A protein has these predicted regions:
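Secretory targeting signatures
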Residues: 1-24, 360-386
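Extracytoplasmic substrate-binding proteins
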Residues: 25-27, 35, 128-207, 230-232, ...
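Short helix-initiation/N-cap motifs at beta->coil->alpha
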Residues: 31-33, 86-103, 147, 234-244
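Short, solvent-exposed loop/turn elements at domain surfaces
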Residues: 36-38, 53-58, 73-77, 205-211, ...
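Structural recognition of the beta-strand scaffold that forms the well-ordered cores
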Residues: 44-48, 65-68, 114-119, 140-145, ...
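A short, structured surface patch at a secondary-structure boundary
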Residues: 46-124, 227-230
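Alpha-helical, coiled-coil/dimerization segments enriched in small aliphatic residues
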Residues: 93, 209-238
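A contiguous binding-surface segment within folded domains or other stable secondary-structure elements
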Residues: 239-290
Length: 386
């Protein structure tokens, strides 16, 4: 009888302990509609992909137990040092997908992963793929949508809820949502009086890559200017390849050119030092502006995460200063403090935006514009004859 009582007590204790453990877990519904069991407190996060890494950083570097990719120079400059020493687990989706179940199982044993988080644009079969790797690893996988400007604020609220940082999520959502609302209101005032622009992502001799309109990566450019590059064909952040003859035909009001690295200005210098580019009025009149790159990520996107909102503050103030009327330096510093927990110095700001505010002068090595004009007209003439 006594033995039976002991067994019964042990059984009841086990039931109580299991119930307590279950009570510590919670069901979270991700953006794909998947119900995922998460710990009551999520502290150890592994990002899947660069976009997730960017977005999650705003909630604090202490959450990371892995990173999606090795840090570049700009990331090392602006982000917390400890990230550079974390293991790399890669990305589950995209052309550079390297994440695999075996590695996640291994990392989970070493560092204890509460959840793997992917952020971005939802695509076909994502739910099935995440269910599959979750089953193989016994590690929760969650997807959060952040694919358009309108989805940014909600993504921060959702992440704040999942991470148990509701207050921080609300703060970020309010700040990011405020930028988007200001942008939409100001562009209504601009109406059809947009400047025309192209965004040069790469230059290789006569080959020039532009971000085409209606691209996932070109949402801000399409909205804040008349992006006169043809409709995007390639889905990558490098866009599609064109020739200088194509650029002459477009003849944009502004040329936005990607920086080639943190505090590097190779592409800008190539444009300003070229006799061919000198044929364009935008070059002659100082309307070539460089988009900061690796600061810690490219302001124009690639990946197109919420950090690209700083380009709204920047381009709006350059293109339409009477409407986007504010101190740009103060706005950029505020953004870096809010988004990266980084206090940007005046010197860093000046170097990052050295060629990013318009009215730039040609470099001393630039050829006489007339040579470029003749070369450009000749190229256009040949193009028209074809």
């Amino acid at each position: 009888m006594r033995k039976t009582a002991v067994i019964l007590c042990l059984f009841l204790a086990a039931v109580i302990l299991c119930g307590a453990a279950a009570a510590d877990d919670r069901v979270f519904t991700d953006s794909l509609g998947r119900e995922v069991m998460l710990p009551a407190e999520v502290t150890n996060v592994a990002p899947s992909g660069s976009l997730a890494q960017i977005v999650l950083y705003s909630f604090g570097e202490e959450n990371f137990v892995t990173i999606s990719s090795a840090l570049k120079e700009g990331e090392r400059h602006f982000l917390a040092d400890r990230l550079d020493n974390l293991p790399v687990t890669g990305s589950m989706f995209g052309s550079k997908a390297t994440m695999n179940p075996e590695e996640i199982i291994s990392m989970d044993k070493k560092v204890g992963i509460d959840v793997v988080i992917d952020v971005g644009e939802p695509k076909k079969n994502m739910a099935e793929q995440m269910d599959d790797i979750q089953e193989k690893t016994s590690v929760p996988f969650v997807f959060i949508t952040q694919s358009t400007l309108d989805s940014i604020a909600d993504s921060y609220l959702t992440l704040g809820e999942m991470l148990g940082q509701e207050e921080r999520g609300e703060e970020l959502a309010e700040y990011m949502g405020g930028i988007v609302s200001m942008y939409e209101e100001n562009m209504e005032k601009i109406g059809d009086d947009k400047v025309s622009a192209i965004y040069v992502t790469k230059i290789d001799g006569n080959a020039v890559n532009l971000l085409g309109h209606n691209s996932y990566h070109a949402e801000i450019l399409d909205g804040i200017a008349d992006n006169i590059a043809p409709e995007a064909v390639a889905g990558s952040g490098l866009g599609d390849q064109y020739t200088m003859e194509d650029i002459f035909q477009m003849n944009p009001d502004y040329i936005i050119v990607s920086g080639s690295g943190l505090f590097d200005h190779d592409y800008y210098n190539e444009i300003m030092g070229s006799d061919m580019w000198a044929a364009l009025p935008a070059v002659q009149e100082g309307r070539v502006i460089e988009s900061p790159a690796d600061a810690p990520w490219a302001w124009m996107g690639n990946p197109p995460a919420s950090h690209r909102l700083v380009s709204i503050l920047w381009l709006g103030n350059i293109f339409y200063p009477d409407v986007f009327d504010y101190d740009l330096k103060e706005k950029v510093k505020e953004f870096y403090s809010m988004f990266y927990n980084y206090e940007l110095s005046d010197e860093e700001y000046a170097e990052m935006l050295k060629y990013s505010t318009g009215n730039a002068e040609q470099t001393a090595s630039s050829p006489a514009p007339v040579l470029g004009i003749l070369a450009g007209l000749g190229a256009v003439f040949l193009r028209l004859r074809r």
